[in-house]
Regions:
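4′-phosphopantetheine-dependent carrier domains
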Residues: 1-192, 199-213
Length: 213
């Protein structure tokens, strides 16, 4: 409560959920999003400090708004150089929560210099949580459902595609246009399923009466 929290990519499903939790506990929210439409949506949620995630200048802007202090917590889902910029806005003794799996799988190296400020780095993978600590997972899920029942949390916005339009769904996702989640439905069945493509195998043939180098 009272901590300054930076939510990176706040218009996605995880980001919107994080905003709801942050407002519930009384955190001061700083958020980034990649389009005007997404930033307008965050304003509708009551977020005041909003920055462009497509520009690395957001770090300098956050430091300017906080008088050079930065934030207490970073909730990150971006890969590459954005990680280093997020470290720059983290206060001493701050917490860095890493949600993006891309850097995990690619074994991206993280410089140790920021850690001289006594910061903590947490890699978060819900799959591992369910696998290693199923009892904790069930307890957390029950607590979350109770918050929905109390009206503290609300369902996320989503954009639906029919299963037969799965290609369009992937294109939409690649354009990074979605706010919230993308949902695939089967209301009308799969009517345009593509037949499997047979891959022909051609063998090489060499005339016996020829020479080759």
């Amino acid at each position: 409560q009272g901590d300054a929290l930076l939510i990176v990519g706040a218009a996605g499903g995880v980001g919107i959920a994080a905003i709801q939790v942050a407002k519930w506990i009384g955190a001061e929210i700083y958020a980034t999003a990649g389009s005007d439409e997404k930033r307008d949506f965050l304003r509708l949620l009551g977020v005041e400090h909003i920055f462009d995630s497509r520009s690395l200048a957001f770090a300098d802007q956050i430091l300017e708004q906080t008088g050079g202090q930065g934030v207490d917590v970073v909730l990150n889902s971006l890969a590459g150089e954005a990680i280093n910029r997020n470290f720059q806005v983290l206060k001493p003794f701050g917490r860095f929560l890493e949600l993006g799996k891309r850097d995990f799988y690619e074994n991206t190296k993280v410089g140790l210099r920021p850690f001289r400020n006594n910061i903590s780095y947490f890699g978060i993978d819900a799959d591992q949580l369910m696998l290693v600590h199923p009892e904790l997972t069930r307890r957390l899920f029950a607590e979350i459902m109770a918050l929905f029942g109390e009206g503290v949390l609300h369902p996320l916005p989503y954009h639906t595609f029919e299963a037969e339009d799965i290609v369009d769904a992937f294109r939409y996702m690649q354009q990074a246009r979605q706010i919230g989640k993308i949902v695939i439905t089967y209301h009308h069945g799969i009517t345009r399923a593509q037949p499997p493509v047979a891959v022909g195998r051609k063998s090489l043939r060499f005339p016996a009466d020829a020479s080759y180098l």
